[in-house]
């Protein structure tokens, strides 16, 4: 019986995530059932939220105390999970969009501007995760590719204040907004901050505690505050593996 339940759950999760998914058999069955029931309650809560908002936002898991503001400007792919206490404010020019199977961790906040100075918005690709207590300020456009994993306490600040004049307060001098881009398949360590204008290439690893601004080439290992390239991931072995995976030939 237990093996049947494990296999049934694996089939369902594999279909949802569109890849093979295997459960750790060391998880006690009672805990696994409890997790499934909790996720089902989150799914029901998401469906009820859709009805209240009179929106069809798909197959979304919502933990308690999720706050969706200006929800008509928020778009969800299938299988998105919003953990406890998440706040998302869709007020923006381009809206806030999540791909399939995105996870937003507990007490994270995503917003894009204010009534007097509308921000651009956020586009987060499929299979991304943003862990607990993170913040995305998308006054400028924030674009995150597919399969990006991010730790706790991640911050995006896609805006800079002008401060050249000293005769008026900084808050009244205006802002500049270049935006922030993280390409596909990146891993971002905890307590990393992205400043306006940051562009991180595909396959980069960002060390915990980094302060990221400027451009970084694909497959870089990036460390420090301010961040710098420590080395490239493109070793001879990695290039060979990539060539085999794509059916090519190593150079």
PLM ranges: what are they?
Residues 169-180:
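A short acidic, glycine-rich active-site loop
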Residues 158-166:
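Short acidic/His/Gly/Ser-rich catalytic and metal-binding motifs that mark active-site loops
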Residues 165, 171, 220-221, 235-238:
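Short, glycine/charged-enriched secondary-structure capping and boundary segments
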Residues 1-157, 183-184, 192, 202, ...:
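Domain-scale signature associated with acetyltransferase and cell-envelope carbohydrate enzymes
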Residues 28, 168-169:
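Short, structural beta-strand-to-alpha-helix junction motif
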Residues 199-223, 227:
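C-terminal/domain-terminus segments
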């Amino acid at each position: 019986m237990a093996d049947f339940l494990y296999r049934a759950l694996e089939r369902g999760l594999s279909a949802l995530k569109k890849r093979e998914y295997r459960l750790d058999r060391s998880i006690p069955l009672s805990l696994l059932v409890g997790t499934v029931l909790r996720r089902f309650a989150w799914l029901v809560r998401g469906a009820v939220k859709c009805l209240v908002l009179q929106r069809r936002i798909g197959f979304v898991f919502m933990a308690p105390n999720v706050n969706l503001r200006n929800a008509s400007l928020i778009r969800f792919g299938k299988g998105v999970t919003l953990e406890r206490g998440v706040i998302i404010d869709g007020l923006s020019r381009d809206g806030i969009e999540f791909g399939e199977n995105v996870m937003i961790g507990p007490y994270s906040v995503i917003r894009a501007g204010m009534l007097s100075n509308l921000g651009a918005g956020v586009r987060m690709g499929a299979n991304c995760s943003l862990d607990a207590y993170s913040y995305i300020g998308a006054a400028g456009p924030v674009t995150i590719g597919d399969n990006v994993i991010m730790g706790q306490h991640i911050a995006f600040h896609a805006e800079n204040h002008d401060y050249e004049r000293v005769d008026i307060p900084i808050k009244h001098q205006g802002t500049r907004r270049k935006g922030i881009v993280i390409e596909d398949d990146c891993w971002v360590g905890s307590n990393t901050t992205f400043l306006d204008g940051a562009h991180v290439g595909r396959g980069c690893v960002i060390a915990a505690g980094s302060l990221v601004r400027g451009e970084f080439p694909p497959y870089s290992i990036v460390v420090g505050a301010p961040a710098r390239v420590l080395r490239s991931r493109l070793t001879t072995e990695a290039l060979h593996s990539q060539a085999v995976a794509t059916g090519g030939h190593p150079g």
